[in-house]
Amino acid sequence: MQTIIKATVFIKGNAVAAVMLTLLMATGIPQLSAQSADNEVPDLAGIWDGGFGARPVNGEHVPWGEENFPVLNERALAYQQVWEEIMAPKYDCQPASSPAIQYDPYHMELVQWPDRVMLRYEKDDQLRIVWLDGREPSSVDFSIQGFSVGHYEDGALLVETTHFVFDIAGFDDYNGIPSSSQLVVNERYWMD
């Protein structure tokens, strides 16, 4: 059984930009391949604005609200019912994980190299590396930010992150949706 949660987060940079997140909680982990020479590398480098109040949703370009709240399985619903925001690790100065860190009102710097992209979040001074060379994660690559691989396609950076450690507030630290080692986050970064 798998639960699919689709999410969209809007982020403003020098141009209008967006991040699309798709979360797949399943036992299988799909793999991304190394960057193809056929895809042009877009210039996404710079400071991106997280935007206050942005949230992932169950669909594209839809405001956050009860009618489009991410679909949760029975276990996640039970967990959410006992959740209180004061339980969030952020109140103990613990770093936020993706995707929760994406929609906090802080900036993110994106730096591009031929074999990797660095995402540096202003909040908690978190660093995240997106590998573009198709490498596989090892058994020790589990972390709060997970292990990210990506490639460029149609003027966008597509990122897939796996290997998260359990985080009590990993998906959404305001609504009590945890993440786990089975979490898969797919992101799309582009500028209009």
Where on the chain are the PLM-derived regions?
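Hydrophobic small-molecule pocket/channel-lining residues, especially in calycin-type beta-barrels
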Residues: 2-3, 28-192
